[in-house]
Amino acid sequence: MNHQQQQQQQQKAGEQQLSEPEDMEMEAGDTDDPPRITQNPVINGNVTLSDGHSNAEEDMEDDTSWRSEATFQFTVERFSRLSESVLSPPCFVRNLPWKIMVMPRFYPDRPHQKSVGFFLQCNAESDSTSWSCHAQAVLKIINYRDDDKSFSRRISHLFFHEENDWGFSNFMAWSEVTDPEKGFIDDDKVTFEVFVQADAPHGVAWDSKKHTGYVGLKNQGATCYMNSLLQTLFFTNQLRKAVYMMPTEGDDSSKSVPLALQRVFYELQHSDKPVGTKKLTKSFGWETLDSFMQHDVQELCRVLLDNVENKMKGTCVEGTIPKLFRGKMVSYIQCKDVDYRSDRREDYYDIQLSIKGKKNIFESFVDYVAVEQLDGDNKYDAGEHGLQEAEKGVKFLTLPPVLHLQLMRFMYDPQTDQNIKINDRFEFPEQLPLDEFLQKTDPKDPANYILHAVLVHSGDNHGGHYVVYLNPKGDGKWCKFDDDVVSRCTKEEAIEHNYGGHDDDLSVRHCTNAYMLVYIRESKLSEVLQAVTDHDIPQQLVERLQEEKRIEAQKRKERQEAHLYMQVQIVAEDQFCGHQGNDMYDEEKVRYTVFKVLKNSSLAEFVQSLSQTMGFPQDQIRLWPMQARSNGTKRPAMLDNEADGNKTMIELSDNENPWTIFLETVDPELAASGATLPKFDKDHDVMLFLKMYDPKTRSLNYCGHIYTPISCKIRDLLPVMCDRAGFIQDTSLILYEEVKPNLTERIQDYDVSLDKALDELMDGDIIVFQKDDPENDNSELPTAKEYFRDLYHRVDVIFCDKTIPNDPGFVVTLSNRMNYFQVAKTVAQRLNTDPMLLQFFKSQGYRDGPGNPLRHNYEGTLRDLLQFFKPRQPKKLYYQQLKMKITDFENRRSFKCIWLNSQFREEEITLYPDKHGCVRDLLEECKKAVELGDKASGRLRLLEIVSYKIIGVHQEDELLECLSPATSRTFRIEEIPLDQVDIDKENEMLITVAHFHKEVFGTFGIPFLLRIHQGEHFREVMKRIQSLLDIQEKEFEKFKFAIVMMGRHQYINEDEYEVNLKDFEPQPGNMSHPRPWLGLDHFNKAPKRSRYTYLEKAIKIHN
């Protein structure tokens, strides 16, 4: 327990009393002493290190500070005078400082009693908050007379920044420790001892490669079980060699699973740091969500090896995976009384072993090959011999070199309707002889296996942590692979500690146990674990992976240096041609020439670089930065190369990044002759852009730009405009100034100067002109002003078919001033249908999908429908095509139900009865939508079904408004059979029949109504049921029949029972309860619906 929390708890009123001295024998987990951190200096005491439990396997390095365990002592002198906490000097384990903390503990409610507080502290002086280290420890007060009488307690704790000490505030009564007769104190000295075993720490500079020779894998999310599997496959060296040899030269780097696996294996072999797996999971074609879905390691192993095996076909390593992992077994059924036997040989790549109720792996194998007796109701159908008593079992023909054993730790619990984890103890040996389970043994090659990998899960069915213990070279020297951290461990930690089950030793947690084992055949050990050297990796693969690394390093460097650079986007004048909107170009469609420029470089340096890149001398180019104006437009502005040449780019751009510049150049046809750009006087000249509008084509034509003095009159520009547009001189023109979106002003007076004719004259102003032609009045948009107004209201809308999931739809350009009918007419033309046969739906604001339907008399505009969309968000509406006019359709309601056809098959249909109608109207609509049987009554009925049972038949005059839909109920329409049209209510009855298997609450299948007669023999009822369900006699013999009432069932004696209608009537006084029903008890052969959500869907590799 962390002692700071302990002190805080004791300060609260009404705290729980701490254990008295006689309670000292309780387990560490039985006390809730919470902890606190003090950093008092060591005031007295000495530390002694002892070899204790040290293991020669562990001490791989000379530097003992990296060891995994240690025993150290701390002697506190003048113990009787101890008044505050004391700390021992540090003992380094896993390169972290561990200290003994001792303190006297006083209790406000018991001032004459105190106890000894004893804690283990880890890494307390570190400023880091990200470190953690799990450890187990034995805390002991030494008895100097008899060590066997020393007092000890165990702890197991995850040490981290917030809880960096753990132990007991009432470890032992003060009076016992200081009693000379007890043997704990000698000359006022008490010796405290700690034996600590620590896992490799996380969040600190742990060098896995240095301490083990291997590196780990980064944890990518809920796929950490995948890390365990990948390490297991990596250390199957023969497989690793084969993966390297797969030809991947032409593979897509992002989609090739073999290449991604080669990459992971190569980095595990050569990297000094943990290796990432994101490229591998990306190659699987996984969605974002997929990589966080907890799955069974067997499932991923099988799918991954299948994928690789298929891609090895036709290569030099074809057959490697079957050679390593495939075994053969035979499933047999042997009849006892007739000469009949059925054998089926099959391959397997892993074996699933049941562990429930089994002590060890041998008992599981015995259970796996145990003979099952097929007798009684479970006899075997031996064809012409009929049902026979038989024996069923499996025998192993061969066992593979690499044996994957899946321990069934996770099982379905029918009581809770979910999977549970079995944490029972289950033992497995380091050496596993399996000859006794083979049908035929080979004396020259006994089936003796060596344990190679132990895959371990800590936690429950809902989640937890995965690690793998590996014996990489098969020599008994084990390592623990915990995601990115790899550490050496003892054989005991790898094997015995992962048996599972309860253990008094807190170093083994109850929920931590093995779920998969990998054994390698002893005779194949050297072959499977053959050394993999650089010579086994194709040179072209090495070069490709190294080039990838170089590119990644370059990109990483660019990201690190990105703050030093800015982007300059150059737009040339040819990008203005063809633009049909406001300003000079569409920012989403324009093609820029992008330069990466140092922010502190000068304009002069950039112009020089730009000149060289674009191939124009500096006197043939001029830069015009695109400047955002206050009215929302973006126009070119003057940049003085001479005056601003020494200014930095970031200064000139006013921190705009990317910075867009219009690059003016000499006409390329004149550039070769040495022509230069005309002079531009920034104080007296202005640059204007010209557009010509053609009302006949409703289009704009870019007519270039001009320099002109500010004092120039509008009339002086008319000849230039006529020339640029290809009009004859003196053509009468109408001129407009394009001010901003939805504001285009006509220029009335051509005899005034530019600064008076144009509003706030600036460089980059746009003049739009058109012919003054009376024929323009016949055009839909006769003037440029109307064109720009229409453009302002123009909107692209995506229309998606509501009835098609994920329909991409089609785009229609509309005006947001359109009303409902105008929109419907436009969409109907696109769909080649009648506007009245369309219904439209708004888009839901909170998610992508159809919302409420629009009525055909909607009075708003398209703008009103789209007002909640964000500016750059795609505008979307939904539609569905109708079979009746919308005016009629809106007076009807949508009614989803099931139609049961004459072949006793169900199909879902949607009907549209009058919303104020009754069941009769619904049935009439159904007659129009379905095909009735030839030999039936032609009359329909509406049933209500809950949990696969019919709970009622609705009367024809019942209002549809009373039928409320719900997820728990289903409405079904069916044709009334001829024998059920007229019922003799005195002697006959319609009863509900439903299917179940063993439990009446587990109904399934299609329920139905059946006519029965008072006094008829039940065999007659059975014949009608068999005929209706069209079941073979042999299958029908397995059915049992029961009368079910109030959740209880009573089986019918088929040979004796005669129908009594009272058995199917509600109990007197309980008319509100459902009627009894006839249950058909038989096995459900239909595939069960998945119990699981999307998060538990089957794993799949898509590439």
Swiss-Prot record:
Cross-link Glycyl lysine isopeptide (Lys-Gly) (interchain with G-Cter in SUMO2), sequence positions: K870, K883
Native source organism of the sequence: Mus musculus (Mouse)
Designated name of the protein: Ubiquitin carboxyl-terminal hydrolase 7
GO cellular component term of the entry, any: PML body
Ranges for domain USP: 215-522
GO molecular function, one term: cysteine-type deubiquitinase activity
Zinc-finger as UniProt keyword: no
Keyword Acetylation appears in the UniProt entry: yes
